[in-house]
Amino acid sequence: MDLINSTDYLINASTLVRNSTQFLAPASKMIIALSLYISSIIGTITNGLYLWVLRFKMKQTVNTLLFFHLILSYFISTMILPFMATSQLQDNHWNFGTALCKVFNGTLSLGMFTSVFFLSAIGLDRYLLTLHPVWSQQHRTPRWASSIVLGVWISAAALSIPYLIFRQTHHDRKGKVTCQNNYAVSTNWESKEMQALRQWIHVACFISRFLLGFLLPFFIIIFCYERVASKVKERSLFKSSKPFKVMMTAIISFFVCWMPYHIHQGLLLTTNQSLLLELTLILTVLTTSFNTIFSPTLYLFVGENFKKVFKKSILALFESTFSEDSSVERTQT
């Protein structure tokens, strides 16, 4: 999801401006920009509607609280995409200033980490609810979930601070301004010593981001849902296959949406093949930007309760506004 300048959406570790987008053909840039604009428009509308449903149309439970903040992380990201698309159409020229360069990069980093962490938290919640029902009955409360939510946001913010610090605007000799990472935090962009230091810090950031932002959460999700699926099948807790569909949706969507991003970031460190970088960049933009649209829809509609409540909520929006009795049926998942 790296789109800030050169589609460096969500904490670009190296600078796609230098390393990849300089190879992009105009058609590729247009594809990326259109993907961002479309994702922003549709994602803002759908995610905003989902947030409304979860906040005002459903009973506040652990489940709805976790999903609310998961979708909130998507919503925050979609609000910034138009700026990234505009920069892409302007050949990665950044005309929004250094402060917004830092804020956007930090915000997008925050959105990536929070979405990944909340997916893991939802998996752990399913695990505890299914395999430790007694403990869950005693401790699994909205207040407990609120502490989890707070911990996720604090952890994601802490991991995003380096990318807020490293991000700077750079003026080249032609007067072009780019928003890119300066890992050495030095104004001496050409020094070999500084370039070596930047490379070392870049590698360290990539490894930590890959481990904490993908590999570890992926294993947590796989472990939790595998255990849940085994227990559900063993006890025949559900006659429907819907719970298994939800589990598979979580695993597949996580892998499909985030694996291309980390592959592209790894390639930036190991290859200069322009075609390969271009293809992986486009794939990264498509999967991560549309992730903000389709992942919330999948999670809300695959689950039967979410689907029912969502349908009722659409019809009840105007009724709850204009009718004297504004109560709306709420369902607890």
UniProtKB/Swiss-Prot annotation:
Disulfide bonds join C101-C179. The keyword Transmembrane helix applies. Residues 54-64, 125-143, 231-246, 304-333 are cytoplasmic. GO terms for cellular component: plasma membrane. Residues 1-30, 87-103, 166-209, 269-283 are extracellular. One of its GO terms (molecular function) is complement receptor activity. The chain crosses the membrane at residues 31-53, 65-86, 104-124, 144-165, 210-230, 247-268, 284-303. It is a multi-pass membrane protein. It comes from the Eukaryota. Keywords: Cell membrane, Disulfide bond, G-protein coupled receptor, Glycoprotein, Membrane, Receptor, Transducer, Transmembrane, Transmembrane helix. Glycans are attached at N5, N12, N19, N272. GO terms for biological process: complement receptor mediated signaling pathway; inflammatory response; phospholipase C-activating G protein-coupled receptor signaling pathway; positive regulation of cytosolic calcium ion concentration. It is found in: Cell membrane. Belongs to the G-protein coupled receptor 1 family. Orphan receptor; could be a chemoattractant receptor. This is Probable G-protein coupled receptor 33. It comes from Pan troglodytes (Chimpanzee).
